């Protein structure tokens, strides 16, 4: 009987030890431009996490930020989301109730471990002499930008353009609306994501200027044909804060909460902040940011909270069905 009891206890101990050292796979639903970033962060985090005796794999799903939010709402079992803007995670919280509405308060800097901004990528020599936002609406200038209804960069682009026009001498909401309407008349195709627009501009050869994430523009310069492009920083842009969050319901269902929370906290560590900077995202760590000051120049930045009343208001006003973008965008005209 004692031998049977010992075998049972040994089996139970082995089972528990196996469970404790079980492989963990996290699914990260992210936006298109972060492919390279999260591949590197996933590898780095896995090596760090392995020291605890567990093996972890980060699997990422990428697409337009708005489309990714809808996928999670519709059932994509993401443990974490790393999206382009807070409104998309707010939608997951309000529509699917997969995480609490106060999710932004759970991590530093409103749950945004890095920032970016919107810049212009032009062709070598800047043949159209594009230097600022007002140059984008000159006759003959073709602008490449993603679709604000599906992507994340696209909504930052739209708001940066709006803020520029509204803050111009004599500017107001009406002049900003007219400027943005004129701007989108110069956009021949609206890709579903910022990465899609990068491909349209650099691989398909369409357009005179690409409006996109700073990190996408810097990445383009590092490609084999990077010498065919140059970055133009406009006179002012916008502070883009891509947030991250635990998807509580999914993580609890899959038993991955501990690993998922550890991963999100890891994004704020010096090791991860360095990786983020090397991948052309502006780190929150000021010492690390200072090391990359030549990569990330200072420029005046609008903010969603100060200039648009926060993401809930901006989303409802500009990007919801029937909002300002739907009112002003007239494809083919």
Name every feature range the model reports, one short phrase each.
Residues 6-16:
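Bacterial N-terminal signal peptides
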Residues 22-150, 329-330:
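N-terminal segment of the mature folded domain
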Residues 1-4:
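Positively charged n-region of N-terminal signal peptides that target proteins for export
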Residues 117-126, 241-258, 275-279:
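A bilobed periplasmic-binding-protein/Venus flytrap-type ligand-binding module shared by bacterial periplasmic
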Residues 125-131, 150, 163-171, 250-258:
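Short helix-loop capping/hinge motifs at secondary-structure junctions, enriched
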Residues 29-31, 122-124, 142-169, 183-187, ...:
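Short beta-strand->loop
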Residues 168-235:
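Ligand-binding pocket segment of bilobal, Venus flytrap-like solute-binding proteins
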Residues 251-333:
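Extracellular/periplasmic juxtamembrane helices and adjacent flexible linkers that interface
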